[in-house]
């Protein structure tokens, strides 16, 4: 198999489709024109030849997605437990074929579940409600962040949404350095998928990605908190609100959860001791 950081095999340079649409504007007649629509395709994650999950996603950065999903769902503990990946077309979408260590594959088969293919849906396929909000090892308090640097990150978050700028249809997730600069980011039609792409990228980057926080352009659901905590992220910033279950999970696993992030303001839901306010 190819190295896990190899380029996707598909020659995809444009992740939108032009369609003839009808527009309506007040006091104007309807007009027809071409406009961009974001691509959304079924993506199957196939471990050692067995399909584990199908998600609806944007068809880019899929090896990062597969790595992040594997980590945030507890399929692996380390990127070293994945030996290689290939992205290949299938009859109805795309497959990420993952070469998983034998030990991890045995564990995966023991708890295998099939998730229905909704856009970034995290509850689909969970067999019992008790499986939601599974226990996460409490995070250490090793990170701090100066809220005065958050404005810089918010200003540049859209830089990682080129498809979103064309279509208004994607979510973004970016890694914020302590200085407020963005080390990198990813977008997707599904907010959970965008976060998984970021978490997968972070797992394969160097030490400069150890310090900082995750920033998402969406609301913060319980699953986004849980995924972040599973990958050792101590601080999660969200542009929109957090749900009650997200707050409960964040409190329980020692994650600092911040919502309604706007220039000059934010709402701190849990564990404010990591944050510095100048």
UniProtKB/Swiss-Prot annotation:
<feature type="active site" description="Cysteine persulfide intermediate">
    <location>
        <position position="121"/>
    </location>
</feature>
<feature type="binding site">
    <location>
        <begin position="260"/>
        <end position="265"/>
    </location>
    <ligand>
        <name>Mo-bis(molybdopterin guanine dinucleotide)</name>
    </ligand>
</feature>
<dbReference type="GO" id="GO:0006777">
    <property type="term" value="P:Mo-molybdopterin cofactor biosynthetic process"/>
</dbReference>
<dbReference type="InterPro" id="IPR003786">
    <property type="entry name" value="FdhD"/>
</dbReference>
<dbReference type="GO" id="GO:0016783">
    <property type="term" value="F:sulfurtransferase activity"/>
</dbReference>
<comment type="function">
    <text>Required for formate dehydrogenase (FDH) activity. Acts as a sulfur carrier protein that transfers sulfur from IscS to the molybdenum cofactor prior to its insertion into FDH.</text>
</comment>
<dbReference type="GO" id="GO:0097163">
    <property type="term" value="F:sulfur carrier activity"/>
</dbReference>
<keyword id="KW-0963">Cytoplasm</keyword>
<dbReference type="Pfam" id="PF02634">
    <property type="entry name" value="FdhD-NarQ"/>
</dbReference>
<protein>
    <recommendedName>
        <fullName>Sulfur carrier protein FdhD</fullName>
    </recommendedName>
</protein>
<keyword id="KW-0501">Molybdenum cofactor biosynthesis</keyword>
<dbReference type="InterPro" id="IPR016193">
    <property type="entry name" value="Cytidine_deaminase-like"/>
</dbReference>
<comment type="similarity">
    <text>Belongs to the FdhD family.</text>
</comment>
<dbReference type="GO" id="GO:0005737">
    <property type="term" value="C:cytoplasm"/>
</dbReference>
């Amino acid at each position: 198999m190819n190295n896990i950081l190899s380029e996707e095999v598909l020659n995809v340079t444009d992740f939108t489709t032009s369609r003839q649409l009808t527009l309506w504007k007040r006091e104007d007649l309807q007009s027809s024109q071409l406009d961009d629509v974001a691509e959304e395709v079924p993506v199957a994650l196939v471990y050692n030849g067995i399909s584990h999950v199908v998600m609806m996603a944007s068809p880019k950065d899929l090896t990062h997605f597969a790595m992040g999903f594997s980590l945030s769902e507890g399929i692996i503990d380390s990127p070293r437990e994945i030996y290689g990946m290939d992205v290949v077309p299938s009859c109805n979408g795309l497959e990420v074929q993952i070469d998983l260590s034998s030990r991890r594959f045995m564990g995966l088969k023991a708890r295998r579940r099939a998730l229905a293919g909704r856009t970034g849906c995290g509850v689909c396929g969970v067999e019992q409600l008790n499986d939601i909000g599974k226990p996460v090892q409490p995070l250490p308090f090793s990170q701090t962040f100066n809220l005065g640097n958050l404005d810089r990150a918010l200003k540049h978050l859209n830089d990682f949404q080129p498809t979103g700028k064309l279509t208004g249809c994607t979510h973004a997730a970016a890694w914020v350095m302590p200085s407020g600069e963005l080390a990198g980011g990813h977008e997707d039609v599904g907010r959970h998928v965008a976060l998984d792409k970021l978490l997968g990228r972070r797992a394969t980057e160097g030490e400069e990605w150890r310090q900082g926080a995750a920033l998402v352009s969406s609301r913060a659901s319980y699953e986004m908190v849980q995924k972040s905590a599973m990958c050792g992220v101590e601080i999660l910033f969200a542009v929109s609100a957090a749900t009650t279950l997200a707050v409960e999970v964040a409190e329980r696993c020692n994650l600092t959860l911040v919502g309604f992030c706007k220039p000059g303001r934010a709402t701190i839901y849990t564990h404010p001791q990591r944050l510095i306010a100048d």
